[in-house]
Amino acid sequence: MREFMHYVTNAFYGATGWNDDNTYKELNVTARELIDFPLPRGLRLTLSSLATPHFATSYQLGSVGIVDGSISYLHSSVPLTGIAARSDRIPLPALLRSYRRLHDLGSKDQQQYVGAEHAPTESTPPAVAKVDGSSLLYGRLYLPQSLLEGMVVRRFTPALQVQLSAVSERSLRNGGTLLGLVQYDKRKYGVEGLASTDGGLLGVRGLYNFGGDASSSAMNPPSGTSASETNGSGPSVEKERIYGRFSAGAELYYGTLNKSGGMSLGARFATLPAHRGTPLTATLTINPLMGNINATYAVLAREYCSLATKMEFNVYSYESEWAVGVELWSNRRPAGFLLGANPNDQAEPAPEPPRKSNERSFQAKMEWRLDDPEPEPQSPVAGEKSADDGPKEEYKGVLKARFDQNFRFGLLWEGRVKSLIFSLGTGRSD
């Protein structure tokens, strides 16, 4: 489950038109969330609130052997008025869905975490802050460890963003660490430069897109045709086939204090929202220095079913590993879901009330008259809504499962009861 502060942070990116998917670090995010999802440890309660459109708070209390907790604050210079902040109104896919479909490069004002249908929801803020100078401040204090972490995000231009993250704790070298990120996004490609005080780390990573909506014809539509008309996706004939975007990238980093470095190469193919077939994502990453090869494949088989598989191989030791993951959504409670209920089944309609017989009532017989005619049912007036016409919840929960070759498994059920969003999980990791 994504934390509330993560949800608000992505709402800030959506409101400012920043594409967080166009980075190398998010190359394999879909398979990672479907297979390597974290399991809850102990009992943990979180209370969060978007107090104002600019300010959010979160308080967490947990018990894992000892009682601990945290206090978080977030401030956004952009008013986040378009997101659902109440836990009974937040669309569950915005917090729980693992499969992430890429959105078009030409429309940066979409929510980063969206469902498979890509329909606008309450959680999708309008892109009202496509101006320079947007900023976000975040701080979190962990108790009783007295560990403090903070983050500052500053938008200088529509294509340039700087992020500073810091952690302060006594056990760390020099009492803390500082990480700086400079992100440059030109839709066709994205470049990041990073520097950290932990080991004097310096690095650079980049991602280049081609094909699909990143092609020259889609990025520069002919005169008289706007990008919204084509949805940034080119001719409709291409959508009948497997229509997606190829991305290739690499990262290179070096530790100036320990005199060690590393690098990796990666490629991804993912279908776009305009694709009319089954959504899928395939990635391949290679670490030449360590000899590791990692391949993943994820598919959204149905609106309520996502599947993923991962294969790792080392060319030096000939060791290999594999793992699979599945995500099943349900609009029923856990009991009905485990008994094999179809998530798309609808409730049976209520039986029609029996019709009254034509026989007169006793009172009408005593007064030598017919019964009064029954009032005709009034049709609702246009524009009026009944009490049952409110927003209907599409899903009530999701079951996530993973399994690997060493018989390690994980089971996680996440859902909502009234205003409480919960996670229950178990697994074997030995």
Curated annotation (Swiss-Prot):
This is Mitochondrial distribution and morphology protein 10. It comes from Chaetomium globosum (strain ATCC 6205 / CBS 148.51 / DSM 1962 / NBRC 6347 / NRRL 1970). Lacks alpha-helical transmembrane segments, suggesting that it resides in the membrane via beta-sheet conformations similar to those predicted for other outer membrane proteins and porin. Pfam families: MDM10. Component of the ERMES/MDM complex, which serves as a molecular tether to connect the endoplasmic reticulum and mitochondria. Components of this complex are involved in the control of mitochondrial shape and protein biogenesis and may function in phospholipid exchange. MDM10 is involved in the late assembly steps of the general translocase of the mitochondrial outer membrane (TOM complex). Functions in the TOM40-specific route of the assembly of outer membrane beta-barrel proteins, including the association of TOM40 with the receptor TOM22 and small TOM proteins. It comes from the Eukaryota. InterPro entries: Mdm10. It is a multi-pass membrane protein. Keywords: Membrane, Mitochondrion, Mitochondrion outer membrane, Transmembrane, Transmembrane beta strand. Residues 215-237, 339-393 are annotated as: Disordered. One of its GO terms (biological process) is mitochondrion-endoplasmic reticulum membrane tethering. The keyword Cell membrane does not apply. The gene is MDM10. Belongs to the MDM10 family.
